[in-house]
Amino acid sequence: MKVIFLVDVKGKGKKGEIKEVPTGYAQNFLIKKNLAKEASSQAIGQLRGQQKAEEKAQAEILAEAKAVKKILDDEKTRVQFKEKVGPDGRTFGSITAKKISEELQKQFKVKVDKRHIVLDHPIRAIGLIEVPVKLHKEVTAEIKLNIAEA
């Protein structure tokens, strides 16, 4: 019997996969526990439609990420920060991913999720700093920061 897996089943199939399994196993286990459904022509058509919609959505997200990368890679895109500095040359406050995200939105109208900004630790130094940002699993860019003394 052909079934469409609704969830990953270890050793049998992954979600969205169409596979031939023994009839008894399909009826008594997979279908009863909502792990799979029978692969009728209507169900297969529905699955193909969902997969196409998902691919289209992923392509749009990737295109958006590439557009943001183009903006961030532009030399003019440099996020400005004015911070109070102590006698040792370190800032009093630290610059976090959240602060960078907010300033990027404020100064350039570019929305980047703070969780995508890769910071090992908050920035406390002044000067020009480049911070990597993972916009998509395939797209990585760098945000240029200019941290000056207030």
UniProtKB/Swiss-Prot annotation:
SUPFAM superfamilies per UniProt: L9 N-domain-like (SSF55658), Ribosomal protein L9 C-domain (SSF55653)
GO molecular function: rRNA binding; structural constituent of ribosome
Family: Belongs to the bacterial ribosomal protein bL9 family.
GO biological process: translation
Pfam families according to UniProt: Ribosomal_L9_C, Ribosomal_L9_N
GO CC annotation terms, alphabetical: ribonucleoprotein complex; ribosome
Protein name per its UniProtKB record: Large ribosomal subunit protein bL9
Keywords of this entry: Ribonucleoprotein, Ribosomal protein, RNA-binding, rRNA-binding
Function: Binds to the 23S rRNA.
